[in-house]
C-alpha cells in the first residue's frame, strides 16, 4: 500500500451524466471525459452511452458487472476495483455514473476514497440527480420549509425519524428490502411495510407524489398525485419501479419562534410576524395549502418601487476583456491548461501578454476577490475598506429565498411603502 502523501502517476475523476439523456452532462464533466485516458461508465440510456463513445473511444461499460441474483455490493466493489487498477497503471481515469455520481452511488465513493488513500489525485464532480429534477418538476424549494431525504429501505430498517412539517423524499421505493440485482423488474413484495410506516406517520389519506424523472428529451416526467391508501391497490402499486421516487408534502406548518427571532434581532420587541402572509407560490401538493394570490399588498408595494428604481452606486457591472474571458473559459473547460496554471500561476499569468496588468495580477493571485475586482467595475466607495491585498471587501449575495426572507414579514401596518 502506497502512502497517502506520495504523488502517484495516475488519477481518478468521477462525474455524473445527469438523468435526462445527454443534455444534463455538464461542460466540466464533458471536458474530463474527452481528456481521459480511459472512461468507465454506468448509465441507463443508450443515447448517453453512444454519446460517451463518440467523445472518447476508450470506454468500458460497468453495467457488465451486474447479474441476476448477484449481490449489488459485490458489483459495486468490482466496479470500483476495475477503475482503480487502471489508475494504479498510471492512467487518468474518468468514471461516469448516471445522475449525481455521489448520490446513492457506492462504487464512486469507494473508488475515490481508496485512490486518495493510496496517494493518487482523485476528485468527484457534481451532477444532476433525480432529486434535482424533482425539485424542478414539482416546483418545490428544499429551503422552504426544509427537506428530509432517505433511502426507503434504510428509512425502515433504522427507523429514521420523520419531520411532518418539512418536505419528505424517499428514494428507491420500488425495491424495498432488495439487496441483489435483476435485469427485469424488482420484486417489490415488501412495499406494504413502507406503506404501513407512512400511514402511521401521516394517515391513510395523506398525499404521496409518485415521481419518475424524464430520461428522454421528448418525454414528460411521471407525476402521479396519490394517497397512501391508493398505493395499497395492487394495480396502482405496479406503477412503482426501481427508478421511482416518492415526494411527501408537509402534513402541517410550523410557526416561527418569537423568542429566537428577537434574539436574532429579526423583530423589534413590539413586532410580530404577519401569520396571514404566505410566500408565493405555496406548495401545490400540500393537503391544506393556503390560497395565496401572486399580487397581494406586499407584492404590489414592491412592484410600485420599480417605477423609481435606479442602479445602486455600489452595483458592480461586468467590465472585462475578451482575452480574460477566453482564458478563464479555457481554465474551466480544459483540464490540461488548468494543470499548467496550478503548477505555476505566476508564469502562466505573465505569459498572457494580451491581458491588462490588473488582469494578469488577478490571475496570478488567483483568488475569487482578485478576479472579481479585475473583471468588474468597482465603485470608488468600495476602497474605503480593503483587505491585506488592497482589494475591496465586497459582500456577494445570491437570490436564494431562505427561512429569514420568508419568515420576517411583519404586519402591513409596519410597511413604509403603500400601494395607491
Swiss-Prot record:
S-adenosyl-L-methionine binds at residues 98, 100, 103, 130, 172, 213, 244-245. SUPFAM superfamilies: Tetrapyrrole methylase. This is Methyltransferase/ribosomally synthesized cyclic peptide gymnopeptides precursor gymMA1. Residues 379-392 are annotated as: Precursor leader. Fusion protein of the methyltransferase gymM1 and the gymnopeptides precursor; part of the gene cluster that mediates the biosynthesis of gymnopeptides, highly methylated cyclic octadecapeptides with striking antiproliferative activity on several human cancer cell lines. Gymnopeptides derive from the C-terminus of the gymMA1 protein, and it is the gymMA1 protein that methylates its own C-terminus using S-adenosyl methionine (SAM). The C-terminus is subsequently cleaved off and macrocyclized by a prolyloligopeptidase to give the final product. The modification N-methylalanine is found at residue 400. Within the homodimer, the clasp domain wraps around the adjacent subunit to position the core peptide into the other subunit's active site for iterative intermolecular methylation.
Amino acid at each position: 500500500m502506497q502512502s497517502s502523501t506520495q504523488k502517484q502517476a495516475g488519477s481518478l475523476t468521477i462525474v455524473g451524466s445527469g438523468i435526462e439523456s445527454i443534455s444534463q452532462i455538464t461542460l466540466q464533466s464533458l471536458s474530463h471525459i474527452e481528456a481521459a485516458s480511459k472512461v468507465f461508465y454506468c448509465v441507463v440510456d443508450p443515447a448517453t452511452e453512444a454519446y460517451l463513445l463518440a467523445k472518447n473511444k476508450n470506454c468500458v461499460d460497468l453495467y457488465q458487472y451486474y447479474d441476476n441474483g448477484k449481490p449489488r455490493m459485490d458489483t459495486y466493489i468490482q466496479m470500483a476495483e476495475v477503475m482503480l487498477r487502471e489508475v494504479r497503471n498510471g492512467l487518468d481515469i474518468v468514471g461516469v455514473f448516471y445522475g449525481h455520481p455521489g448520490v446513492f452511488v457506492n462504487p464512486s465513493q469507494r473508488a475515490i476514497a481508496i485512490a486518495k488513500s493510496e496517494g493518487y489525485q482523485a476528485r468527484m464532480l457534481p451532477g444532476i440527480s433525480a432529486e434535482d429534477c424533482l425539485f424542478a418538476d414539482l416546483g418545490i424549494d428544499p429551503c422552504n420549509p426544509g427537506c428530509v431525504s432517505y433511502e426507503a429501505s434504510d428509512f425502515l430498517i433504522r427507523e429514521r425519524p420523520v419531520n411532518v412539517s418539512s418536505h419528505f423524499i424517499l428514494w428507491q421505493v420500488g425495491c424495498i428490502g432488495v439487496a441483489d440485482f435483476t435485469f427485469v423488474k424488482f420484486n417489490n413484495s415488501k412495499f406494504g411495510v413502507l406503506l404501513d410506516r407512512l400511514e402511521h406517520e401521516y394517515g391513510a389519506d395523506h398525499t404521496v407524489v409518485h415521481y419518475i424523472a424524464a430520461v428522454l428529451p421528448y418525454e414528460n416526467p411521471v407525476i402521479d398525485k396519490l394517497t397512501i391508501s391508493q398505493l395499497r391497490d395492487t394495480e396502482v402499486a405496479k406503477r412503482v419501479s426501481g427508478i421511482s421516487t416518492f415526494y411527501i408534502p408537509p402534513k402541517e406548518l410550523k410557526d416561527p419562534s418569537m423568542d429566537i427571532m428577537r434574539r436574532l434581532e429579526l423583530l423589534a420587541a413590539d413586532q410580530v410576524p404577519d401569520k396571514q402572509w404566505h410566500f408565493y407560490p405555496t406548495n401545490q401538493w400540500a393537503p391544506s395549502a393556503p390560497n395565496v394570490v401572486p399580487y397581494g399588498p406586499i407584492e404590489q408595494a414592491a412592484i410600485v418601487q420599480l417605477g423609481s428604481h435606479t442602479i445602486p452606486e455600489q452595483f458592480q457591472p461586468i467590465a472585462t476583456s475578451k482575452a480574460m474571458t477566453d482564458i478563464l473559459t479555457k481554465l474551466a473547460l480544459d483540464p490540461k491548461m488548468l494543470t499548467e496554471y496550478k503548477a505555476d500561476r505566476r508564469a502562466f499569468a505573465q505569459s498572457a501578454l494580451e491581458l491588462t496588468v490588473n488582469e494578469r495580477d488577478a490571475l496570478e493571485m488567483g483568488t475569487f476577490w482578485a478576479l472579481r475586482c479585475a473583471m468588474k467595475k468597482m465603485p470608488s466607495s468600495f476602497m474605503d475598506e480593503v483587505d491585506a491585498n488592497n482589494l475591496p471587501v465586497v459582500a456577494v449575495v445570491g437570490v436564494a429565498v431562505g427561512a429569514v426572507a420568508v419568515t420576517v414579514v411583519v404586519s402591513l401596518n409596519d410597511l413604509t411603502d403603500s400601494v395607491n
